[in-house]
């Protein structure tokens, strides 16, 4: 009997809070644009949709539940993809602001950043110099002196809210220490397996994007958690597809989307997150890997609710 092929979960992060509207005309900003981008990504093979929101007037990241209200119902009506609402929001926001949409909408999945860190976006000023909105340049400049605050108390608070809402978490780990922070909460029985770890590579302030960095993260997670977790990786910027390919070959799930990279190939802007999902899906299928559906994702990782 032939062995069933491994199913790979594709997460798509369609807008995020890192890039700004002046960097790409394809970055979705309004609720309808974000919802439409998510629906197209799901149709291309993404089983998880990681969602941020933006002010529809100037594109600035926002955690206003009223803006999310214009995004979530449309996606749920058109797809069966798993909704993953950010609790990271933007490093410029308070933890209380960041938690609001997940608290209100009680999604089946939410992201949770597993440690405080420097969050350097200012190198993008070397590539982009003209901005339509004042906040865009300010956000990048201020990241020279910015700590993305995720203390143990912050993490515990978000975990408790998630538990009360039957929300599970995608644990975003930007460095090796974040895996140890996760282990701390597992040892305190505040997190139960199986859990979903998103390893983030190539963001200034976190772990690098060298193949050895990827393997170090994998070896450490295996040692700490054994078979109790699903591993996913994302590479920031130019590292997106290279790391997705390397990770998939090592047993990882993958994440793509315009939150993580504006590009589809060197020097060419991606016209949609769907394009990136399609590209990574083609890579995975060349490896003879199956693409997970939302149903198979649920089977692989966690029970799901139907709150949003």
State where each predicted segment sits.
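Active-site beta->alpha loop and helix N-cap motifs at the rims of alpha/beta catalytic domains
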Residues: 68-72, 76-147
């Amino acid at each position: 009997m032939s062995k069933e092929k491994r199913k790979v979960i594709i997460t798509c992060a369609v807008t995020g809070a890192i890039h700004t509207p002046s960097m790409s005309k394809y970055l979705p900003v309004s609720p309808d644009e974000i919802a439409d981008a998510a629906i197209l990504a799901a149709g291309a093979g993404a089983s998880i949709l990681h969602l941020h929101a933006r002010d529809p007037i100037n594109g600035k990241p926002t955690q206003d539940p009223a803006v999310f209200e214009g995004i979530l119902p449309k996606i749920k009506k058109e797809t069966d993809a798993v909704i993953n609402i950010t609790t990271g929001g933007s490093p410029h926001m308070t933890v209380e602001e960041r938690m609001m949409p997940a608290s209100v909408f009680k999604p089946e999945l939410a992201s949770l950043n597993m440690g405080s860190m420097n969050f350097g976006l200012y190198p993008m000023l070397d590539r982009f110099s003209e901005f339509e909105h004042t906040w865009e340049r300010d956000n990048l400049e201020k990241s020279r002196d910015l700590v993305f605050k995720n203390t143990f108390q912050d993490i515990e608070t978000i975990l408790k809210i998630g538990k009360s809402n039957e929300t599970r978490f995608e644990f975003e780990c930007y460095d090796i220490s974040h895996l140890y922070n996760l282990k701390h909460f597992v040892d305190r029985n505040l997190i139960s397996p199986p859990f979903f770890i998103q390893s983030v590579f190539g963001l200034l302030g976190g772990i690098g994007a060298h193949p050895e960095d990827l393997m170090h993260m994998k070896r450490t997670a295996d040692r700490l958690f054994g078979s109790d977790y699903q591993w996913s990786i994302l590479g920031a910027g130019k590292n997106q597809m290279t790391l997705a390919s390397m990770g998939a070959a090592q047993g990882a799930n993958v994440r793509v989307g315009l939150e993580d990279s504006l590009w589809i190939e060197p020097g060419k802007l991606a016209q949609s997150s769907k394009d990136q999902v399609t590209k990574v899906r083609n890579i995975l299928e060349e490896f003879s890997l199956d693409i997970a559906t939302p149903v198979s994702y649920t089977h692989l990782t966690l029970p799901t609710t139907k709150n949003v």
